[in-house]
Amino acid sequence: MAPAKSHITHPPCSLQLKAIALGVACAAGIHPLQVAAQDETAVIEELVVWGRSLQLLGSADSASQGVVGYADFSTRPLARVGELFEVVPGMIATQHSGPGKANQYFLRGFNLDHGSDFSTFFEGMPVNFRTHAHAQGYMDLNFIIPEIIERVDFKKGPYFANTGDFSLAGTSSMKTYDTLERGFVEVTVGSGDEIRVVVANSFSTEQGSLLYALEHQQTNGMFGLDQDVRKYNGLLKYTGEIGGIPSQLTLTAYDSEWISTNQVPQRAVASGQIDRFGFIDPDLGGQSHRYSLSGRFELGEWDLTAYASAYYMSLINNPTYVLNDPINGDEFEQEDERLLFGGSLLRKGAFDFLGLQAASLVGAEVRYDDVQELNLFNTRSRLRYDSVREDDAQELSLSAYAESEFMVSEKLRLTTGLRVDYIRFDVEALRPQNSGSDNDALLQPKFGLAYRLADSLEFYANYGHGFHSNDVRAAVNRIDPVTGEDTEAQDILVEGRGGEIGFRYDNLRGFNVTLTAFELATDSELVFVGDAGTTGPSDPTRRSGVELNAFYSINDRLVIDFSAARASGHFRGLPDGENSITDAHENVAAAGLSYVGTQGITASLRLRYFGDAALTEDESVMKEDSTLVNAGVSYAFGAWEMGIDALNLFDAEDDDIAYFFESRLPGELEAVEDIHFHPSNPRIIRAMLRYSF
C-alpha cells in the first residue's frame, strides 16, 4: 500500500502566506512536514505538501530540472521500489528478471539497462557500480525503504559541473527524513502470498535526533515459479552535532535472496509449452547484500561527504537455454563482491565580477572501488562446474569542478562550468593476458542560460559535455575468455555532448508546466555482454526529443499531474532503415489524479503509457506498447489507517520488456531467432494496516 499521507499543520491563513511560510521553511532547512502550530487556541487544518508544486523560477538551471517528494510519494501506489523514479517525467522502471535484481530503466530514448547513463546518489553516496559483474552502472535500489524518502532532486543532461560518471541522460539525489512527525508500524498483505512489515520512528538525543526504520518483505509473486523472496532492510540516521560540527550519519543494511523467472521465448508460449508467466529454467535467481555508512559534515564554508560500502551479489541466469551447450545448458552465475570508499568536498560562495553579482560552486570528489570478486561461472542446477573468468579490479577516480553563475541583469543568468575526471585502474585476470593497468582523463565544459521573460515564465538554454565510464576490463582484455580469439582494447571514458532549450511556467497558484527540447550525441555505447564476459562498442549515436510536464493543484486537496515525452534515437554513420537504436522507446506518458481529504480519505489513480520500440535496427521486429493503471485508497481514523491498492487495475496482458535474439530450447535442433519477453505483473491487490504512535 502507498504510505500514509504527509501533511503539516498550522493556523489558517491566506494561500499566499502559506506559500511564503513554506518557502521560508524550506530555505532555512526546516523540515516542512514537521512545522507545527504554535498557537494552540487556533483552529488547526492540514496543508498537503507536493514536491512538484515547489516554485523553481529563478533558481532552476534548466527546464528539465525538478523536485519530487512529500505527498508525491505518499499518495502513489508502488509495485516495486524502482518505481520511485517514475515520478521523474519521462522515466520508466521495469523488470526483466527476478525482484531482487536491479530494475531496467528508460529515459530520453535510452534503454539505460540497469543504470548506465543515469546516476543516483543516496544521502551523498553513489548507488551505481562501476565494472560490475552483471552490468556497467548497475543501480540496485532494493536497499531503499520508500516510506523514509523525503525528496528526490533530479536533473537531466550533461550540463552541470557537479555531475559526472553515468549522468549523460540525467542524475538524481535522494534524501531521507531527518525526523518523523510520528512513528508507525505498517503491515501489508497481498496477492502472491506477499507480506511486508515496516517499522519506523525517530526521537531526540542530547545533541540531535535519531531515526530508525526496519523493513521485511516476503512474497512468492505472480509467476509460474514461486519467487520465494526474502528481503530485509534497515536504516539508522543521526542528525545533529558531532564535536560541535553539524553532521548527519546514515547507516543502511540490506540482505535479500530470491528465485526468478527470466524473459521467455514467444514461440514457447505460442506452442502452449508454457504460459505467459511460465519459465524454462527453474534454477534462476540470486542473493545480494549491501551494508553502507555515509556522513555529511558542515565545515564552515565547506561541506564534506564521506561514504563506505560493502557489497555482494550472486546472480544465476540463462537467457539462451541450450544454445551454446546442448548437454549442460547455458546457465551461468555472475558474482560481484567489493568494497566502495569515497567522498566529496563542496564550497558555495559569492563574488563580484566586472560589476556583476556572481555565485560560485567548487568541489572535488574521490572514489575507490576495490572489486575483490568479479567472476563468471558456468553452472548446472546452480552448481559451478567451469570458470569462464575470475577477475579482480581496483578503480580509483578523482574529479574536480568549478561553476559560476552571473547575474547579468535582473532577468538574465549565465552559468559556466568546467569539470575534469581522472580514472586509474588495475585488473588481475585468471588469464594473465587479460591483466593490466591504465588511466584516462576527460575535460568537460558546461554552459547555461536562464532568462526571466515574466514573473511566471522563464526560458532556459543549456549545453555541456559529459561521459560514462565502461568496464575497465575492456581496456586490457586481449583474449576473448569464451572463444580464445584476440580482442581489441577499448576506451574507458566515452564522451557525450548534449543541449536543450525549454520554458518553465508557474502561476504561483498551484499550476506549473515545463516544455523541453533536447539532443544528445555519444561517441559510442560500449556494451558489456555479461553471459559471455566480453565487451564490445556500438556505433556513435544521436538522440533528440521533446518533453512536457504539468502539475495542477485544483484545490488544497485535489491535484492532477501529466507528463509526456517523445524521443528519437539513431546510430550515426549507418544508412537509413538500418540505424535504429534497439529497445529505445519513442513515446512515454503518465498521468495521475490524487486526493487527500479532510476526513481521512486519501485516493490516487495513475496511468502509465510505454510506447512501442524497435527490437532490430531495421525495425522489422517491434515490441508492442503497454498501458498500465494503478489505483489506491486509504482511510485514516485516529492513530489507525487502512487502505487497499490495485496494481494493474484492469489486468492488462502487457510486457515489461522484450528482446530479439537467438536461443535454443531443449528438443530444438538449431538456434531460433525470437522475441523474448517478460510480462508485466497481472492484477495485484494489496491491503495495508498502519498504526501511528
Task: Go through each PLM region and give its residues.
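Face-selective signature of the C-terminal outer-membrane beta-barrel domain
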Residues: 241, 245-254, 286-430, 450-452, ...
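Extracytoplasmic beta-strand/coil segments of soluble accessory domains associated
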Residues: 82, 86-129
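Short strand-turn segments of transmembrane beta-barrel domains in outer membranes
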Residues: 153-161, 170-203, 214, 221-222, ...
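Short acidic/polar hinge/loop motifs at secondary-structure boundaries
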Residues: 126-156, 174-175
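C-terminal beta-signal and adjacent terminal beta-strands/loops
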Residues: 4, 560, 612-614, 634-693
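Transmembrane beta-barrel wall of Gram-negative outer-membrane proteins
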Residues: 184, 189-218, 223-261, 284-296, ...
